[in-house]
């Protein structure tokens, strides 16, 4: 859908199994692997047979609801052919729009603003500043108009001021068809104050004549931690889309946090539904900047008939010593449960203790000679996020008068991390 002199034109909205992507494949977040032991050969990760069942391996899960969960020994697959596919590509977003397309629509007294109303892309992580193309005006604007086909549009901008040097520059635009069935909205903003806080953000939403709706919010923040005095940059994104033709939709929440000493935290919560099938995924990464790393993934799915299945794993390492563990499980509509658990203990001396068992009687417990590999540092860290946040860093706060100092509330903590509760489908902002 685009707002122009000819009006609003809706674009297709595809949430069918054919239009969805493949699930459950984990996000290929590893771009570089660092060896933390004596080995000097080209790093590569080795997994035990049990670890191979963890969600690090790209595979297709299939469930046959007619078969009992406690299947034959070693069974690791079941099938559900209607399950939509959900790829997990790199967190670096691959959006189709370009920055230069946005600037003309915020020119005062220019043509009607052009809508960027396509639904957000799934599993594209957090977009960059350049992909959003936020361009705020230095003057207040309030305009509206009607196109030849009866569709309407509006555009406005402003500059709000507050206590403690608070400043918020913003721009808002949108439009709708003559009958109101098609609509789009978009807002940009930048915030700052005398404490050094800076924020750049955007939010957009839309709906079409078929009843499909979508919403997306993006934000990046720079602030100084009151207790450590370290600079921090945090980026986040929330995305949602719903189908108007069937019981289908998805929701994602992504976040990344960095500080100047290498502390890094990343994670995502995801939820999707296609008619009688639902699926969830949560994953997280934590680096303390001194060598400790924690990573985990938890994925599960279910059908309205009662079939459920999932896979989860976790790894912790420091100075070449650590552990990995995980579980794959399945519950049939009748309540029969099958599971396989596995674990690894890495001692840092070339010895690895591997163990595991399953509800079908499998078990193993042995010590093997094996090198230990893991990522001790994030592939995208503080230096990278600073280099990609030039627009955020260039935000100019209101000039502080001599002798006036910012008020800092030490009782307030840094923004709370996202809840561990499974994400659901929040209501559309357009409803």
Swiss-Prot record:
A GO-annotated cellular component: starch grain
Key words, A-Z: Chloroplast, Plastid, Transit peptide
Main location: plastid
Listed Pro residues bias regions: 415-431
GO molecular function, one term: starch binding
InterPro entries attached to this UniProt entry: Alpha-glucan_binding_chloro
Record's protein name: Protein EARLY STARVATION 1, chloroplastic
């Amino acid at each position: 859908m685009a707002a122009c002199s000819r009006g609003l034109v809706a674009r297709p909205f595809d949430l069918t199994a054919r239009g969805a992507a493949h699930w459950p494949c984990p996000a290929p977040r590893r771009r570089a692997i660092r060896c933390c032991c004596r080995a000097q050969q080209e790093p590569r990760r080795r997994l035990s047979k049990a670890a191979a069942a963890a969600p690090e391996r790209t595979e297709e899960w299939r469930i046959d609801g007619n078969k009992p969960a406690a299947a034959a020994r070693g069974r690791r697959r079941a099938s559900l052919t209607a399950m939509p596919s959900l790829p997990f590509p790199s967190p670096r977003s691959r959006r189709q729009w370009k920055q230069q397309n946005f600037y003309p629509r915020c020119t005062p007294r220019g043509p009607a603003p052009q809508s960027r109303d396509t639904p957000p892309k799934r599993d594209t992580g957090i977009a960059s500043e350049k992909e959003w193309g936020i361009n705020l005006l230095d003057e207040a604007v309030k305009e509206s108009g009607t196109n030849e086909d009866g569709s309407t549009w509006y555009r406005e901008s402003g500059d709000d001021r507050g206590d403690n040097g608070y400043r918020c520059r913003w721009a808002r635009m949108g439009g709708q068809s003559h009958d109101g069935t098609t609509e789009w909205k978009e807002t940009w903003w930048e915030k700052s104050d005398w404490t050094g806080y800076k924020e750049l953000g955007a939010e957009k939403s839309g709906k079409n004549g078929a009843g499909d709706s979508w919403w997306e919010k993006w934000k990046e923040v720079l602030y100084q931690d009151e207790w450590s005095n370290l600079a921090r940059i945090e980026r986040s994104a929330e995305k949602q889309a719903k189908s108007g033709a069937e019981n289908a939709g998805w929701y994602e929440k992504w976040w990344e946090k960095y500080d100047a000493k290498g502390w890094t935290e990343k994670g995502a919560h995801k939820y999707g539904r296609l008619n009688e099938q639902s699926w969830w995924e949560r994953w997280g990464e934590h680096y303390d900047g001194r060598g400790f790393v924690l990573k985990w993934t938890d994925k599960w799915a279910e059908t309205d008939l009662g079939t459920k299945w999932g896979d989860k794993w976790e790894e912790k390492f420091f100075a070449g010593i650590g552990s990995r563990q995980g579980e794959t499980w399945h519950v049939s509509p009748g309540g029969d449960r099958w599971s396989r658990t596995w674990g690894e203990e890495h001692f840092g001396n070339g010895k690895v203790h591997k163990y595991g068992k399953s509800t079908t009687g499998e078990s193993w417990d042995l010590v093997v000679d094996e090198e230990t590999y893991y990522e001790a540092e994030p592939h995208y860290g503080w230096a990278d996020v600073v280099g990609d946040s030039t627009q955020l860093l260039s935000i100019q706060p209101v000039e502080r008068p001599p002798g006036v100092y910012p008020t800092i509330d030490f009782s307030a903590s840094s923004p709370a991390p996202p809840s561990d509760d499974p994400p659901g489908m929040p209501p559309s902002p357009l409803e």
